[in-house]
Regions:
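N-terminal leader/targeting and accessory segments in enzymes
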Residues: 1-108
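Walker A (P-loop) phosphate-binding motif
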Residues: 105-123
Length: 123
């Protein structure tokens, strides 16, 4: 897959990124690059987010600040959890109840990483 090709796992999906620190911001960029529609939420206030996180709005990301409300799950196919976000967040329980998959941010890298073996086995 070249840099301009889109990962079929994300193309056309609606993803919610929970937590907008470095990892969440990077996850949102990766999802955008691979054709997903992205919404991002963070419990911090808008003025407390990094300028890098806020530039995502200009790229089409819907950024919601100061809340972790379950309404952010509307229309989502995937929830991406940033590493610093507590796993017992009520939002995650609601996503599970709705049957929306939750992936740690690092799994996005595994989904798009090229690791060809050229038919060699790995032991």
């Amino acid at each position: 897959m070249t840099a301009t090709q889109k990962a079929p796992w994300f193309a056309g999906k609606h993803a919610l990124v929970v937590g907008m620190a470095r990892s969440g911001t990077a996850a949102a960029r990766l999802l955008l690059r691979h054709g997903a529609t992205v919404r991002a939420i963070d419990r911090r206030r808008r003025e407390d987010l990094s300028s890098e996180a806020m530039t995502l709005e200009g790229r089409g990301v819907e950024v919601r600040c100061g809340t972790m409300d379950a309404s952010a799950l509307e229309g989502c196919d995937l929830v991406v959890a940033s590493p610093g976000v507590p796993a017992d967040l009520p939002l995650f329980r609601e996503a599970e109840r709705r049957g929306i998959p939750i992936a740690p941010e690092i799994e996005l890298g595994f989904a798009v990483a090229r690791a060809p073996t050229d038919r060699k086995s790995v032991v």
